[in-house]
Design a protein with these regions (language model features):
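Soluble non-cytosolic domains of exported or imported proteins
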Residues: 26-34, 122, 126, 145, ...
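Alpha-helical elements of Rossmann-like donor-binding domains used by nucleotide-donor carbohydrate transfer enzymes
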Residues: 35-38, 42, 130-131, 173, ...
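C-terminal catalytic histidine-bearing segment of alpha/beta-hydrolase fold enzymes
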Residues: 141-188
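The feature captures the conserved acid-bearing segment of alpha/beta-hydrolase catalytic domains
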Residues: 81-146
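Primarily recognizes the serine-hydrolase "nucleophile elbow" in alpha/beta-hydrolase
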Residues: 26-108
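Hydrophobic residues in well-ordered beta-strands that form the structural core
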Residues: 1-2, 58, 144
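Serine-hydrolase catalytic machinery in alpha/beta-hydrolase-like enzymes
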Residues: 1-45, 156-162, 169
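Active-site loop signature of alpha/beta-hydrolase-fold enzymes
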Residues: 7, 97, 153
């Protein structure tokens, strides 16, 4: 797991509801994809990693970075394909405003799945639904799984999240769905 926050002075990540005040050096659209592609390059040097079967997954702001990274126009890679970039991306409850960079949608170069709660109190599930619809209209293989009543961080295993029935239901569905997605796209 790449830690783009700690080395840049944010060892605990961002405080909740701080989207508009985050520093440029942690921009999820222009900087964090570079971290992801740096990690990909490193992983491909390892003998214990199958170099052409690496996927990307992120949660919250990391999910936003995942969406930007999976774009065919992401910084850090030229003309990406599933063979040269990541095989797939999985984004759990991203903020889909993406600094206004993808107002017309994202055309991912590999399949992307987005999991979001309809009652997310931190970022807009409506905005993600709009982004996914625009991205699909561009021909992107991107799908949204919207969980009724689930909140931001619905898959957090703590009782404070899992005692909420909608969060628990979403978690029980999302985990096997994520495993099945990655199993399908990462098979030889």
């Amino acid at each position: 797991m790449v830690d783009g926050f700690g080395p840049r002075g944010y060892p605990n990540g961002f405080p909740r509801f701080s989207y508009d005040s985050r520093p440029d050096e942690l921009n999820e659209v222009t900087v964090r994809p570079l971290d992801a592609y740096g990690a990909l390059a490193y992983l491909r040097t390892r003998s214990d990693v199958v170099a052409d079967r690496i996927a990307l997954q992120g949660w919250s702001n990391g999910a936003s970075a995942t969406l930007a990274t999976m774009s065919a126009t992401a910084p850090g890679i030229t003309a990406p394909t599933p063979a040269s970039g990541f095989r797939a991306g999985l984004a759990f409850y991203p903020a889909c405003g993406l600094k206004g960079q993808f107002a017309d949608g994202i055309k991912p170069y590999a399949p992307v799945r987005v999991f979001h709660g309809s009652a997310d109190e931190e970022v807009s599930p409506r905005r993600c639904a709009e982004l996914v619809a625009k991205s699909r209209a561009l021909g992107g293989d991107v799908q949204l799984q919207l969980y009724p009543g689930a909140e931001h961080g619905f898959d957090d295993p703590s009782p404070s999240r899992q005692d909420d029935e909608a969060n628990a239901d979403a978690t029980r569905d999302a985990i096997p769905r994520a495993i099945a997605f990655f199993s399908g796209v990462l098979k030889p």
